[in-house]
Structure formats: C-alpha cells, structure tokens
Regions:
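Short beta-strand->loop structural element characteristic of the AMP-binding/adenylate-forming
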Residues: 24-27, 82-88, 159
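Conserved AMP-binding/adenylation subdomain of ANL enzymes
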Residues: 34-57, 61, 65-104, 119
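Glycine- and other small-residue-rich loops at beta-strand/loop junctions that grip anionic moieties
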Residues: 2-5, 61-62, 86-87, 139, ...
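Conserved AMP-binding A3 loop
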Residues: 3-4, 11-40
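Short Gly/Pro-enriched turn/cap motifs at secondary-structure boundaries
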Residues: 4-5, 181-184
Length: 184
C-alpha cells in the first residue's frame, strides 16, 4: 500500500451549547506530532484516572452528538477497549446492557441515575452490575441524595467531573473524596 503523505491524527470538532451566544464549532489545532498512534492528553487522563484499557467495556447511554459521549467513547477506543452504544436511554435497558455485556465503565448524567433509582427494587436486583469499576458523570450538578443512593447501590465507583467543550480544563472528584465532602 502507498503511505498517506500526512498521517497525523485528526481531532474532533465539537460544538458549544451556545450558552453565551450562538452555538459554534470549537476548532482544535491538529497535533504537532505526525504519529497517528500517539496518545492525546485526554486519552492519557482516561487511561490513568479512569482506568480505560484494552479490557474496558464502556456503556454509552447518551447520543454521540453530545460532547461527553463522543469524547469518552473515542478515548475507550484509543485505549483499545470496547464501546456499547444504546440507541435510546431506558433505565432498565441500561441495567440490562451493563449485565449482558459486563460493562466496566460508562458515562452518565444525573437524570440517568434518577431514572434507574426509580425502578422497583426487584427490577434493580435482577441485574449484576459487579463488573462496573468506573461510572463517570457530569452535565449537571448531581443532587446529594441521588449521588449517595448511587454510591450505596453501585459502590464507590462514581467519578464526577466538570469540563468544557473547548478543552480548557477539567476537574474530577471520586466517590471516596466526595463522601468526605458531600456536594463537592
């Protein structure tokens, strides 16, 4: 095969929500290093802080046109893992997918948690979620009672983060730290 002259890794172009005006594409410069197999900083973070690797089986219950589902799914692929996509979020369907595919991680929003917590106890108990080691969540503040109930149910696997589509920074808190400072 003939090599392509410029095999630099591409970058995604996400669109802002338009909070401060019209939605616009957030253009990120192409990486300087031409190696397509180089890991970017977000992949390094996902592999380090979140444990994404070749054994990761990631559940994406949200549409890929949103920044977080797209970016986290891309990071799982870059780490060599597997992504399970849901066509549409359904609380019991998410539990069934986690059980069936033995997912190890996923990205959620507080509304997903609320809907899963509203399921009857016997429905929730029907599914084995013991393979989950990382449930990242963002998009809105998670109410203290909801987060506490999720940690009680799934264990200390929740990691909350705050970031922007522009890629200008991120902050994270794991379950252990959150439990010492609820509402953080």
């Amino acid at each position: 095969t003939t090599p392509i002259a410029d095999q630099r890794a591409g970058v995604d172009m996400l669109y802002s929500s338009g909070t401060t005006g019209r939605p616009k594409g957030v253009r990120v410069p192409l990486p300087e290093d031409p190696a397509i197999d180089q890991r970017d900083p977000l992949t390094n973070l996902a592999m380090g802080a979140l444990g994404f690797n070749v054994d990761s089986i990631y559940l994406s219950p949200a549409p890929m046109y949103h920044a977080a589902p797209l970016r986290w799914s891309m990071r799982v692929h870059k780490a060599g893992g597997t992504v399970v996509l849901m066509e549409k979020f359904d609380a019991e369907g998410a539990l069934a997918a986690m059980d069936r595919y033995r997912t190890t991680c996923g990205q959620f929003v507080p509304t997903h948690f609320v809907r899963m917590l509203k399921l009857p106890d016997e429905t929730r108990a029907r599914y084995d979620l013991s393979s989950m080691r990382c449930a990242i969540h963002a998009a809105a503040p998670c109410p203290i009672p909801v987060k506490r109930a999720m940690i009680d149910w799934w264990g200390p696997v929740l990691i909350e983060y705050y970031a922007g589509s522009e890629g200008n920074g991120m902050t994270m808190i794991d379950s252990a730290n959150w439990l010492t400072h609820p509402g953080s």
